[in-house]
Amino acid sequence: MSVSATENDVPRFFVGCEESDELLDQSKPENLDNLYEHTEDEEDEEDDEYDSPPERQIVVGICAMAKKSKSKPMKEILERLSLFKYITVVIFEEEVILNETVENWPLCDCLISFHSKGFLLDKAVAYAKLRNPFVINDLNLQYQIQDRREVYRILTNEGIMLPRYAVLNRDPNKPEECNLIEGEDHVEVNGEIFQKPFVEKPVSAEDHNVYIYYPTSAGGGSQRLFRKIGSRSSVYSPESSVRKTGSYIYEEFMPTDGTDVKVYTVGPDYAHAEARKSPALDGKVERDSEGKEVRYPVILNAREKLIAWKVCLAFKQTVCGFDLLRASGQSYVCDVNGFSFVKNSMKYYDDCAKILGNIIMRELAPVFHIPWSIPLEAEDIPIVPTTSGTKMELRCVIAVIRHGDRTPKQKMKMEVRHQRFFDLFEKYHGYKTGKIKLKKPKQLQEVLDIARQLLVELGQNNDSEIEESKAKLEQLKTVLEMYGHFSGINRKVQLTYLPHGCPKTSSEEEDCRREEPSLLLVLKWGGELTPAGRVQAEELGRAFRCMYPGGQGDYAGFPGCGLLRLHSTYRHDLKIYASDEGRVQMTAAAFAKGLLALEGELTPILVQMVKSANMNGLLDSDSDSLSSCQHRVKARLHEILQRDRDFSSEDFEKLSPTGSVSQIKSMHFIKNPVKTCDKVYSLIQSLTSQIRQRMEDPKFADIQLYHSETLELMLRRWSKLEKDFKTKNGRYDISKIPDIYDCIKYDVQHNCSLKLENTMELYRLSKALADIVIPQEYGISRPEKLEIAKGYCTPLVRKIRSDLQRTQDDDTVNKLHPLYSRGVMSPERHVRTRLYFTSESHVHSLLSILRFGALCDETKDEQWKRAMDYLNVVSELNYMTQIVIMLYEDPNKDVSSEERFHVELHFSPGAKGCEEDKNLPSGFGYRPASQENESSKKHTHANDSDEDLGVCRRDEPDRALVMFKPMVSDPIHIHRKSPLPRSRKIGSVEVLSDNNSHLRTARLLEQKHIGLGFELYSMVPSICPLETLHNSLSLKQVDEFLSAVAAPSSDYQMDTPTASPSTPGFYTYVGGRKISLNTYTPTKILPPLFPVSTDVEMSDSVFQSCSSTSMVPGLAGSADNTERNHQAQDD
């Protein structure tokens, strides 16, 4: 929202009384004299003021019971509404409403009035008739909202789906409406039979005593719902008979998986939705750590958005709440509550005030001759200028993101032979597949119980068979007892059947070999998202909003509000996918929390908003099964790094055939790999020695390590690395280098309070080794990198291609039906977002595909050459690494033109390292097409060549820094108060230009320093800004590239595919016209297959089939069924 104010402006926000009438009269225009009581003197004053001319004030009256008008949500919204320059808010006192005649009520131009218990609706109706103000929520229809029978009648007339119901009216004057026959497991109401379970609702909407009756097969009885009392919202009763007095609605019980959806509209074009635990479930109100009822964020589908539109208009309630039941793939309205606010959502308060203010100003500004027009918000029209000076519309954002900061991953192997382990193995059907994974809390508890029992037995007798594993049993017990509870996402146990026992190859196993069957128990723990990782993800989510239209707007005092408005006004189609690793899923949830300004715990967000993508290998890979190419690569890597001599020129060619600057730099730093490993090993020995000293030192007795780790666990972590890194034959296990780097990076960042010596030296040496080992594990030569990358990423590449091409979902998911979109500004404009959260392997692999898959020709494309030079310098793809693809559409170009669609590619290597590197690689900044255009204006010529990009290089990172260095707000207290700047009035016509950007930058940096005192921030590395790799790719070029990469290996070639339905040579005939279909022509802009009449409401099925690519055979080109399967996931 535009902001126009001075420091002297203060919100005009006061409680009305009889004395206030005179004050209010002074703000009335003379042409409305007949509506208000005036004296001649007051009229003369008004004439003088009008000639001045004065600032006319629109008075908004709040007429409701004090409990409602002075509630926290109402105060929050009115406080924001008062910031409008021309709006003054007056609250009618409850005593005045109840005891004064309507002639003595305060005057207002706009009335917000609504019924609640004790409210005199008749008087409010009389006041509206007397004064004729602009009414936000229709008063007469509020009578009908109080009667569930009338509510259901209106909903039925509007074609809104309801549960099947019948009305029992116990009215002596209408005996035909009171036919009730009750059976053991059913009731018959006026000829309509309802089998148990069914619902019995009083016809009065003010009576919340709703009963649900259960069948005898389920135990009978009933659940009695009521208004929340403390922590209860229902109780179970053994009573199975229906009530015999009063009138009721009987309806079919809808199975909803234990959640109800509550929808809150502000006008027909905005709806906020939340899910809560159904009160019918167990009656226990779920509350979060702050004592608030847990509400789950919800994305409404197209039908639900249309329902919200209809409900708002049918009941003439601008601000309206209603309840949805999601059951059997449908959505049913079961209650309409009238005037209702969301609780505890600052984002909703901001949105509600803004929309109400605009509605009021739009209606009354012309009457008062106020020079006001509804501000054109950046987020209302998602269009950006490009380098060529044209306007392009953001259509799609795809991001692949690595998880946030995590604890070190740890693993322990032990061979077990006790019968209790075999019993557990058999219980979970291990003999069918030869292995089982135990992750659920109940399963882990069983393993812990076995470990405890065996250790007790060891204490009672010296059973040598068990004694051999005592230390490992102790560790198994210690790890499973960590945190005091099982969450199911941070520990797991694998059991593998070994018919002839375990082959003894590791230094940690005994030398003898037994031939009888055994089980290999592998305990994995750690690798969980840290509190710092959650902050990283949430803050990056906030920063991510800035990439969307309106992202630079300053409304509400925080950047990125454009995305939030886009999301809530039905024009954002968002889906978030995550692999099945706990750290990845929690990163996705934290990111979603920041992206959409959600509140509360992460678990409800995870449950409702993050889709698991592990069913088809989209984001997961079986790390236990390496490809033959990976085995060859690892063997060659280990061989080169085991040579006790300085790297030769031949070694440089063998290890870095791609010419990676970062790897060559590390090799120069290492010189002799074995000598460097010797240093690393001695430093680890020193570290374990220091930890033992700390354990014996009383000063460190109560020290609290990061994330509840103890000194004992820290010692075990390093002792195991010390033991495993150097094998019995004196050679080093190179595969342990990533683990060593992982651990020292974690301790340097999080456990610096121990003040261990030489940790930074160990960090530098292990990082140099890891910078060689980690990237090369995904291939050394280009062909190897591509082969391994395809093994990891082919399903994801197919899905990305599908996201860019197939947009039929956009027409049915992310906006209103066109027939109902006439009131929405730019209803066709919408953005599709797909976020994929995954682990390091997929990020490395996808980047390899982009770098080495021949997307562009470096010799001919200077921008791509510079991008490749930048990537060559990047040494590590750290936590929160991002690869972002953005698709724009120019609606002014022909549908078959290659210029219609425009793709941009951006990249960030994620979190910065523990040691500030002065030579940190710097690209050319974040340069979306919109900013390129601004830069071009600064130059004397309009050429958009790459040379110009180099000139503006130094300016761009500053902008990127503001946007993607996300340490700007305190994540713990982010919703402590409204982010709105309270001292300013929100005006209507001032637009923040780029000239104000330096002020915004200063404010963001100032905010950043405020949060630096918080303990968590010292542990959260800032994230490298996004760098633009390319900002002028065509969709055709990207699509053909992705198609070639995703093709089977035998067909894989980087040449353009031959003519097929997905190439420019393919034509189809639609309505007698020949239409050229290109890979760069998504179905969204194809002409309709038959004329659509606007006079008849189109059914959902027809609408979907009209949008579906199945109507145009072969449009997807050579993509196989896997791509279509991934697309089906989006539904």
Curated annotation (Swiss-Prot):
Reactions catalysed: 1D-myo-inositol hexakisphosphate + ATP = 1-diphospho-1D-myo-inositol 2,3,4,5,6-pentakisphosphate + ADP; 5-diphospho-1D-myo-inositol 1,2,3,4,6-pentakisphosphate + ATP + H(+) = 1,5-bis(diphospho)-1D-myo-inositol 2,3,4,6-tetrakisphosphate + ADP
Residue sites binding ATP per the record: 148, 201, 208, 227, 251-254, 260-262, 278, 323, 335-337
UniProt-listed InterPro entries: Acid_Pase_AS, His_Pase_clade-2, His_Pase_VIP1, His_PPase_superfam, VIP1_N
GO biological process: inositol metabolic process; inositol phosphate biosynthetic process
Molecular functions (GO terms): 5-diphosphoinositol pentakisphosphate 1-kinase activity; ATP binding; inositol hexakisphosphate 1-kinase activity; inositol hexakisphosphate 5-kinase activity; inositol hexakisphosphate kinase activity; inositol-1,3,4,5,6-pentakisphosphate kinase activity
Positions of region (Polyphosphoinositide-binding domain): 385-456
EC number(s) per entry: 2.7.4.24
Enzyme class: transferase
Gene3D superfamilies from the UniProt entry: 3.40.50.11950, ATP-grasp fold, B domain (3.30.470.20), Phosphoglycerate mutase-like (3.40.50.1240)
Subcellular location(s) per record: Cytoplasm, Cytosol
This protein's UniProt keywords: ATP-binding, Cytoplasm, Kinase, Nucleotide-binding, Transferase
Disordered, as annotated region: 21-53, 912-951
Major localization listed first in the record, in broad terms: cytoplasm
Residue stretches of biased makeup (Basic and acidic residues): 25-38, 934-951
Source domain of life: Eukaryota
Family according to the record: Belongs to the histidine acid phosphatase family. VIP1 subfamily.
Domain notes: The C-terminal acid phosphatase-like domain binds PtdIns(3,4,5)P3 and InsP6. Despite its similarity with the phosphatase domain of histidine acid phosphatases, it has no phosphatase activity.
Name of the molecule in the record: Inositol hexakisphosphate and diphosphoinositol-pentakisphosphate kinase 2
Protein's organism: Xenopus laevis (African clawed frog)
